[in-house]
């Protein structure tokens, strides 16, 4: 397979041509995960360390969470939250394939799980050293790759995404330990 380093991410590999990912050597053995180059940068910027407690607030499909686990050398704790339990099944399938042992899934909307200052789930009761919040977005940034999206976006849907992002930021910031990073 002809491949080379990506232009920005220090951990990325770019294939010379497209192919079936699941047929690539090492895929089934969990030696890599396919992710956009920009997505690879986020876990690197969070500067996680082995032994830390980390929250991946909008986790599915799990690429960033499994990357965090690798950076943590599979030591510590990652709580992966997503609104859709079916999407968390995909996160856990990726964890099994990649050998991630430190991730615990939690299905639910963080805005409801944390609420108005009341943490309603024991996995969220202790503060986190690091929090990754890749909040759901409008998708406007990928219109070049998915131009059909312009037919589905409305000013109202964009405003709803913005409001959700603000609410998620407010909720996750309350879960961060003093001196932690979000």
What does each model-identified segment do?
Residues 1-182:
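S-adenosylmethionine
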